[in-house]
Amino acid sequence: MSIRYESVENLLTLIKDKKIKPSDVVKDVYDAIEETDPTIKSFLALDKENAIKKAQELDELQAKDQMDGKLFGIPMGIKDNIITNGLETTCASKMLEEFVPIYESTVMEKLHNENAVLIGKLNMDEFAMGGSTETSYFKKTVNPFDHKAVPGGSSGGSAAAVAAGLVPFSLGSDTGGSIRQPAAYCGVVGMKPTYGRVSRFGLVAFASSLDQIGPLTRNVKDNAIVLEAISGADVNDSTSASVDDVDFTSEIGKDIKGLKVALPKEYLGEGVADDVKEAVQNAVETLKSLGAVVEEVSLPNTKFGIPSYYVIASSEASSNLSRFDGIRYGYHSKEAHSLEELYKMSRSEGFGKEVKRRIFLGTFALSSGYYDAYYKKSQKVRTLIKNDFDKVFENYDVVVGPTAPTTAFNLGEEIDDPLTMYANDLLTTPVNLAGLPGISVPCGQSNGRPIGLQFIGKPFDEKTLYRVAYQYETQYNLHDVYEKL
């Protein structure tokens, strides 16, 4: 029995009913990776020996009817900027090549406690800076729907592995769209939770006021199951929130009659491709047929999202990445003959082009002569963007729109044009700036490449997002398409 495209929910039932052993599931996953990943290139490191050992231990517990854990026996792939004790965590950078952590991230502790099985680490844009997974030092992941196309980024490996049926779920991180955009490009479900919903302890920091870990899956309910497992306050992360409600599944099947949905006119404006507009408009009609009330609204400061995001994120990155200096860990230049040379050469040689670009931008924005003109002004714009959402949410339950302005572009098409690449974040960065939850679900295809629909919710109201996304998924999904890839 092949379980390659089985859902998390179905796998849990099969294991609970003893129709399949965790070790059989893990074997099937590694067989699929061996067959498919030389083409997709989603994994950077595999943890096969430990995974098989863990699965065999779970077999014994299964035989004793001791199947504790929300994700008992479920295989998982983890983005390579999330710390995994004893397994390489490189952030897809030469700077951290062969770096093996000696502690565990909070999300990994939670997943291990729920008896999920770590399969390996997934490719990404270097230090999560990029929108195509092409800035990875190690390899370029391809889109399972079209091998000429990018999978999106920065969590491109996480999205591609799920779409290709290599793992039933993965974790990514989202700073300005890095879960939702690759989810849209690869036709899977990706959730960026509310800022503070999931602990960031053990996530290698890019922009600390924006970063958030979230799940990628092939359906909405699976996504909700995984988020339940990783949510919660953490003493090791002072920005994590104490929120009691982490039940995202019990009401997921509830209808959406009367739900008030806002469609911002800016989300279907300039820069959004016609095929994407058409798919989203069709999705809106579907929501109406399900009983939702959809009305046009305005989020007037949307256009300032990209410039303010790139100033703030780059400024925080220039500070966070200052720790990589060639001294304590990471790449150490062998050609340096003084301390100053060691700093300069280790960072110049260890970081890639895009990472250095953002460090330069952030350092400039924080410099004394430009701080007020760039960083301070961007923070003021951030407040305006948040206020726009607050005003809309006084009268509406959910905001809907495209996840990305286009479908996936071709490999090599935009990598040398950073401004065009940054423009792809038009519809995702405002959600991070406002600290809100956002989920991307498939809503169509154009020339064989998936289109993503984004739902944005009130702070800590992931439950409503899952409900509306689940109901929409009953009318449109790609479940029958994955196996044909």
Curated annotation (Swiss-Prot):
GO terms for molecular function: ATP binding; glutaminyl-tRNA synthase (glutamine-hydrolyzing) activity. One of its GO terms (cellular component) is glutamyl-tRNA(Gln) amidotransferase complex. Keywords: ATP-binding, Ligase, Nucleotide-binding, Protein biosynthesis. It comes from Staphylococcus aureus (strain bovine RF122 / ET3-1). The active site is at K79 (charge relay system), S154 (charge relay system), S178 (acyl-ester intermediate). The keyword Protein biosynthesis applies. SUPFAM superfamilies: Amidase signature (AS) enzymes. It catalyses: L-glutamyl-tRNA(Gln) + L-glutamine + ATP + H2O = L-glutaminyl-tRNA(Gln) + L-glutamate + ADP + phosphate + H(+). Its EC number is 6.3.5.7. GO terms for biological process: translation. The lineage of its organism: Bacteria, Bacillati, Bacillota, Bacilli, Bacillales. Heterotrimer of A, B and C subunits. The keyword Nucleotide-binding applies. Allows the formation of correctly charged Gln-tRNA(Gln) through the transamidation of misacylated Glu-tRNA(Gln) in organisms which lack glutaminyl-tRNA synthetase. The reaction takes place in the presence of glutamine and ATP through an activated gamma-phospho-Glu-tRNA(Gln). This is Glutamyl-tRNA(Gln) amidotransferase subunit A. NCBIfam families: gatA. It comes from the Bacteria. Pfam families: Amidase. Belongs to the amidase family. GatA subfamily.
